[in-house]
């Protein structure tokens, strides 16, 4: 059976398929994992929306889904407090948790080789994650963000960062494009970081995005998805048209994307009224089983996705 859930107005859905049919007029390839709906926590401390300033493809309800999300984020102040939904206090904790998750992954995947590391910050907002975290680890970071005043703020914030001597670790490119329309350059990125934004995409656009994004990974590159997690099923926020999925829901979507979980970690020390947050490191090849029964982590070999 499909995941059960509800929206922020109290409407219950027997499945994610039913919800997507109601919201965008089509079944959005919902995953199949039975679950019971939960009471809604406070609004998530997510950052920016991922629908585009440009209109999303498709017609009718799907366009309305994305345009409503963009309208919401266009009304949000381009500040840390704004993009974190009034929870600017979680910034330091968030950065610390992300750093602790990423450091060992970089060491394991890339070792001590002098490699020019490049990351993509998806749903980058004002450049909060890039400035406070990604630029510590990567020589270049590209930012993709659909809300123009957020991206303009990111350019200003990161220019200031460059002026204090961090020229060897720089924000390289700024793309004002929604994720559902974005395709990365082939083989450019060591890490594609996606945080507090994938909830803006219906399931079918979620799957399409990851399938396109695979071509952007270098050999041994990987995705990190950091997101709010519902205890069961899903919770749909009608204010900004975003969905909070359960861990089981995400895992079904990862399978549909042809992605494998390399590691998972919970974000700690968030305010109790917020959703839980998990970090997933995702790779494109299934870990092989060694003779001792342990899984060996192979290098990624990104392939061109053909239509």
From Swiss-Prot:
Gene3D superfamilies: Vaccinia Virus protein VP39. It catalyses: N-terminal L-alanyl-L-prolyl-L-lysyl-[protein] + 3 S-adenosyl-L-methionine = N-terminal N,N,N-trimethyl-L-alanyl-L-prolyl-L-lysyl-[protein] + 3 S-adenosyl-L-homocysteine + 3 H(+); N-terminal L-seryl-L-prolyl-L-lysyl-[protein] + 3 S-adenosyl-L-methionine = N-terminal N,N,N-trimethyl-L-seryl-L-prolyl-L-lysyl-[protein] + 3 S-adenosyl-L-homocysteine + 3 H(+); N-terminal L-prolyl-L-prolyl-L-lysyl-[protein] + 2 S-adenosyl-L-methionine = N-terminal N,N-dimethyl-L-prolyl-L-prolyl-L-lysyl-[protein] + 2 S-adenosyl-L-homocysteine + 2 H(+). S-adenosyl-L-methionine binds at residues 123, 128, 145-147, 179-180, 195. Keywords: Methyltransferase, S-adenosyl-L-methionine, Transferase. One of its GO terms (biological process) is methylation. It is an enzyme of class 2 (transferase). GO terms for cellular component: cytoplasm. Residues 38-54 have a biased composition (Low complexity). Disulfide bonds: none annotated. Residues 38-60 are annotated as: Disordered. It holds the Pfam family Methyltransf_PK. Its EC number is 2.1.1.244. GO terms for molecular function: N-terminal protein N-methyltransferase activity. Alpha-N-methyltransferase that methylates the N-terminus of target proteins containing the N-terminal motif [Ala/Pro/Ser]-Pro-Lys when the initiator Met is cleaved. Specifically catalyzes mono-, di- or tri-methylation of exposed alpha-amino group of Ala or Ser residue in the [Ala/Ser]-Pro-Lys motif and mono- or di-methylation of Pro in the Pro-Pro-Lys motif. Belongs to the methyltransferase superfamily. NTM1 family. This is Alpha N-terminal protein methyltransferase 1. It comes from Oryza sativa subsp. indica (Rice).
């Amino acid at each position: 059976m499909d995941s059960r859930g509800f929206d922020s107005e109290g409407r219950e859905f027997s499945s994610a398929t039913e919800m997507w049919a109601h919201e965008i007029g089509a079944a959005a390839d919902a995953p199949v994992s039975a679950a019971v709906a939960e009471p809604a926590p406070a609004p998530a401390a997510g950052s920016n929306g991922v629908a585009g300033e440009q209109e999303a493809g498709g017609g009718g309800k799907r366009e309305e889904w994305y345009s409503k999300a963009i309208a919401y984020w266009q009304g949000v102040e381009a500040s840390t407090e704004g993009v974190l939904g009034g929870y600017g206090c979680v910034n330091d904790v968030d950065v610390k948790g992300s750093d602790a998750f990423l450091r060992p992954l970089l060491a394991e995947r890339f070792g001590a080789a002098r490699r020019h590391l490049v990351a993509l910050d998806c749903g980058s907002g004002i450049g909060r994650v890039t400035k406070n975290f990604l630029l510590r680890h990567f020589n270049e970071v590209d930012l993709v963000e659909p809300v123009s005043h957020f991206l303009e703020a990111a350019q200003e914030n990161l220019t200031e960062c460059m002026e204090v001597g961090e020229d060897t670790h720089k924000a390289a490119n700024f793309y004002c494009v929604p994720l559902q329309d974005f395709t990365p350059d082939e083989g450019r990125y060591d890490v594609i970081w996606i945080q507090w934004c994938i909830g803006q995409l219906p399931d079918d656009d979620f799957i399409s995005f990851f399938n396109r994004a695979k071509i952007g990974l270098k050999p041994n590159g990987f995705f990190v998805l950091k997101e709010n997690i519902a205890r069961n099923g899903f919770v749909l926020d009608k204010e900004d048209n975003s969905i909070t999925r359960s861990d089981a829901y995400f895992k079904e979507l990862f399978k549909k994307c042809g992605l494998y979980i390399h590691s998972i970690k919970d974000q700690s020390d968030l305010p109790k009224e917020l959703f839980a947050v998990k970090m997933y490191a995702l790779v494109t090849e299934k870990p092989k089983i060694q003779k001792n029964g342990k899984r060996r982590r192979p290098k990624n070999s990104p392939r061109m996705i053909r239509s």
